[in-house]
């Protein structure tokens, strides 16, 4: 098993509903360690930069508007197969299709406001982590 790092966002809808603690509990219960975390209110430019790969997609404008609608929590998770583990914890993108007990089934209202984001691969995790955190902000958990 490989120890990996992945990137996670608790989106504005879940932050507004005070689900941060419950979501962090799910990460930790699943064996993922939070090694960096902060609350950010994205500017339009920050959101457009983060989601640049989707800039030509029809939902891009609505995505940027949603992601700038309120504060978000960004965090770096570390653990065995962290990318896959976090994706399993999150559940399907559409909460109507997400398995019971997943974050999206429990905390999301729609495919557009689906509570959380998680990296889909180690390479994207590295890029997404670097977008929000400097190397000095990452605190490996040795105990």
UniProtKB/Swiss-Prot annotation:
Cofactor: Mg(2+)
Stored PROSITE patterns: NDPK (PS00469), NDPK_LIKE (PS51374)
Catalytic activity field: a 2'-deoxyribonucleoside 5'-diphosphate + ATP = a 2'-deoxyribonucleoside 5'-triphosphate + ADP; a ribonucleoside 5'-diphosphate + ATP = a ribonucleoside 5'-triphosphate + ADP
Coarse class of the protein's main subcellular location: cytoplasm
Disulfide bonds: none
Subcellular location: Cytoplasm
Chain residues that bind ATP: 11, 59, 87, 93, 104, 114
SMART domains cross-referenced by the UniProt entry: NDK (SM00562)
Gene3D superfamilies, per the entry: Nucleoside diphosphate kinase-like domain
Function noted in UniProt: Major role in the synthesis of nucleoside triphosphates other than ATP. The ATP gamma phosphate is transferred to the NDP beta phosphate via a ping-pong mechanism, using a phosphorylated active-site intermediate.
Family listed: Belongs to the NDK family.
UniProt-recorded name of the protein: Nucleoside diphosphate kinase
